[in-house]
Amino acid sequence: MSDNDQLQQIAHLRREYTKGGLRRRDLPAEPLTLFERWLGQACDARLADPTAMVVATVDDKGQPYQRIVLLKHYDEKGLVFYTNLGSRKAHQIEHNPRISLLFPWHMLERQVMVTGKAERLSTLEVVRYFHSRPRDSQIGAWVSKQSSRISARGILESKFLELKQKFQQGEVPLPSFWGGFRVSIEQMEFWQGGEHRLHDRFLYQRDDGAWKIDRLAP
């Protein structure tokens, strides 16, 4: 198959979106109410990793980066995720805390995008979550100097076994280089696929302490 044939095959990959629309009259006043409803439906539909979200950050040269992390908590203060504080995303957030999140619920023909500002979680919040994780995950947090270059996977595996032996008694301590971020919600956009590419998009945006809702063209 030639490169041109392959490109033609990709160009023709499409499907109709038929799972229903989204109407203004059905929207709650608060975006988190709709987010919670959609997240619950994603869980009920047994989607793989329904809490997985794309986190987009920008470096000091304006280059954007994206990666998938798991949402671990949300409330009116924002959406929470955890990471190695030496990671590329953590350094980029330190330089520019304005970030974007995206929940891609393809099987439900939905996506939710959040824009806002990330801020570090308190040590108490981080400690509570860290000790709720499986023990091997706690040890794994110690192993990796995230985003650094390594020569082989065996280095990580050997370090994991070494630390598992070291921490076999008592609690695994919280690494000083591990923490979390809360992303405030300045905007939240809900997208529902529609027939003939007439998708439904609604944007919630803060306006003098209240939420303004606008329909956007697809």
From Swiss-Prot:
<feature type="binding site">
    <location>
        <begin position="197"/>
        <end position="199"/>
    </location>
    <ligand>
        <name>substrate</name>
    </ligand>
</feature>
<feature type="binding site">
    <location>
        <position position="129"/>
    </location>
    <ligand>
        <name>substrate</name>
    </ligand>
</feature>
<protein>
    <recommendedName>
        <fullName>Pyridoxine/pyridoxamine 5'-phosphate oxidase</fullName>
        <ecNumber>1.4.3.5</ecNumber>
    </recommendedName>
</protein>
<keyword id="KW-0560">Oxidoreductase</keyword>
<dbReference type="InterPro" id="IPR012349">
    <property type="entry name" value="Split_barrel_FMN-bd"/>
</dbReference>
<comment type="subunit">
    <text>Homodimer.</text>
</comment>
<feature type="binding site">
    <location>
        <begin position="14"/>
        <end position="17"/>
    </location>
    <ligand>
        <name>substrate</name>
    </ligand>
</feature>
<dbReference type="InterPro" id="IPR000659">
    <property type="entry name" value="Pyridox_Oxase"/>
</dbReference>
<dbReference type="GO" id="GO:0042823">
    <property type="term" value="P:pyridoxal phosphate biosynthetic process"/>
</dbReference>
<comment type="pathway">
    <text>Cofactor metabolism; pyridoxal 5'-phosphate salvage; pyridoxal 5'-phosphate from pyridoxamine 5'-phosphate: step 1/1.</text>
</comment>
<dbReference type="InterPro" id="IPR019576">
    <property type="entry name" value="Pyridoxamine_oxidase_dimer_C"/>
</dbReference>
<feature type="binding site">
    <location>
        <begin position="146"/>
        <end position="147"/>
    </location>
    <ligand>
        <name>FMN</name>
    </ligand>
</feature>
<keyword id="KW-0664">Pyridoxine biosynthesis</keyword>
<feature type="binding site">
    <location>
        <position position="88"/>
    </location>
    <ligand>
        <name>FMN</name>
    </ligand>
</feature>
<dbReference type="GO" id="GO:0004733">
    <property type="term" value="F:pyridoxamine phosphate oxidase activity"/>
</dbReference>
<comment type="function">
    <text>Catalyzes the oxidation of either pyridoxine 5'-phosphate (PNP) or pyridoxamine 5'-phosphate (PMP) into pyridoxal 5'-phosphate (PLP).</text>
</comment>
<feature type="binding site">
    <location>
        <position position="133"/>
    </location>
    <ligand>
        <name>substrate</name>
    </ligand>
</feature>
<dbReference type="InterPro" id="IPR019740">
    <property type="entry name" value="Pyridox_Oxase_CS"/>
</dbReference>
<feature type="binding site">
    <location>
        <position position="201"/>
    </location>
    <ligand>
        <name>FMN</name>
    </ligand>
</feature>
<dbReference type="Pfam" id="PF10590">
    <property type="entry name" value="PNP_phzG_C"/>
</dbReference>
<feature type="binding site">
    <location>
        <begin position="67"/>
        <end position="72"/>
    </location>
    <ligand>
        <name>FMN</name>
    </ligand>
</feature>
<feature type="binding site">
    <location>
        <begin position="82"/>
        <end position="83"/>
    </location>
    <ligand>
        <name>FMN</name>
    </ligand>
</feature>
<comment type="similarity">
    <text>Belongs to the pyridoxamine 5'-phosphate oxidase family.</text>
</comment>
<dbReference type="GO" id="GO:0008615">
    <property type="term" value="P:pyridoxine biosynthetic process"/>
</dbReference>
<keyword id="KW-0288">FMN</keyword>
<dbReference type="GO" id="GO:0010181">
    <property type="term" value="F:FMN binding"/>
</dbReference>
<feature type="binding site">
    <location>
        <position position="89"/>
    </location>
    <ligand>
        <name>FMN</name>
    </ligand>
</feature>
<feature type="binding site">
    <location>
        <position position="111"/>
    </location>
    <ligand>
        <name>FMN</name>
    </ligand>
</feature>
<feature type="binding site">
    <location>
        <position position="137"/>
    </location>
    <ligand>
        <name>substrate</name>
    </ligand>
</feature>
<comment type="pathway">
    <text>Cofactor metabolism; pyridoxal 5'-phosphate salvage; pyridoxal 5'-phosphate from pyridoxine 5'-phosphate: step 1/1.</text>
</comment>
<feature type="binding site">
    <location>
        <position position="72"/>
    </location>
    <ligand>
        <name>substrate</name>
    </ligand>
</feature>
<dbReference type="InterPro" id="IPR011576">
    <property type="entry name" value="Pyridox_Oxase_N"/>
</dbReference>
<keyword id="KW-0285">Flavoprotein</keyword>
<feature type="binding site">
    <location>
        <position position="191"/>
    </location>
    <ligand>
        <name>FMN</name>
    </ligand>
</feature>
<dbReference type="Pfam" id="PF01243">
    <property type="entry name" value="PNPOx_N"/>
</dbReference>
